[in-house]
Each structure stands twice: as C-alpha cells, then as structure tokens.
Amino acid sequence: AHPDDLEFTCGATVAKLALDGWAIDIVITTSGNKGTKDAKVTGQQLAGEREQESRAAALILKANEPKFLGFPDGMLHADDELRELLVREIRRLRPELVITWDGFRPGFNHRDHRVTGISAYDAIYPAADDHLFHPDQKHEGLEPHRPSAMLLAGTDDPDYHIDIEPFMDIKISALLAHASQMGGRDA
C-alpha cells in the first residue's frame, strides 16, 4: 500500500528471496503523501521524497525499480480501476509469488492495507488469469497469468514461516532508507 510497507512487513523475506536468486518486483499502490505530522511539508513534496526513499530501499533489498501507482493515501478503493492496474502489473511481471496485505484481517488495519490486499486477491483470481478480463491488455502483449502462490502479510493467522533472522540487518538498512518515516521528519 504505502512506500515503506514492504520493508516493515516483509523486508527480510524479500532480502532472502533476492539473495536466493528471485527477481523482486515491487508495486506500491499509494503515494505516501499523507504520512507525516510535519506541517511544513506538502503532500506533493512528501510523495516525491517517499518515492526516492522507496527506490533507495529497493536497491538495498536487491529489488527492481518500484512501480508507483500513485493513489493518494487514505483514498484507495477496491474498485475496477485498481484491480485493472494490478492485473496489468501481474500480466506484465508474471510473478510466481505475490506478497500482499491480508485484506480480510479483522480489527485495526489501515484502509489502504485492506484495499490493497483485497484488490490484489481479486486481481490474482480470477482476473489476471482469465482472458475475458481486460481483453484490451492482450493487444498490448500482456497475456493472462496466474501466480503459483500468494502470501499475506500482516495476518492474524499465519500459516507459513520463513527464517528471516539472517536477513534482519538488510531489512533494517532498507527501513532506514525511509528517513521521512524513521525520524528524519516529524513522522
């Protein structure tokens, strides 16, 4: 959802996968334009800073250049527009594995996290794999694709575990790249 969510939730897992030879692609649904209490910064300035921070963190994690969908913070909707954009990215990137938020988690959970998780879930099945969803994408060379697996971050009911201890230093370094969120501003 937000520019620093990957690093907070699964940064060490992503570092492990990258070091194991996986190609890592990151899709960030929101701009991060409201993630501050600093009254001196505009949302546009903050969004630009957070994009740069995400690029720096991606380099640390050995990930490819992040894709920014640019929706404003707190304004994300689980609608056809977002699902179509996520289908496009799934078809373009053709991932074996997708890690996203648990959009079904009860209790406290940021709206953008819930919406991103539910929309990713809906994009993966059935939309990305069905040629009748968004057929115009085929004319762009984007063929249907269904990832082999999806992991949910921020879930209350984990059923899959990865030993991340050896990769925590990389995760922390990637987190620190998000200076606007790690004390570099009145976050």
Predicted regions: what they are:
Residues 77-187:
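Metal-dependent de-N-acetylase/amidase catalytic core
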Residues 1-94:
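Active-site rim/loop-helix segments in enzyme catalytic domains that contact anionic ligands
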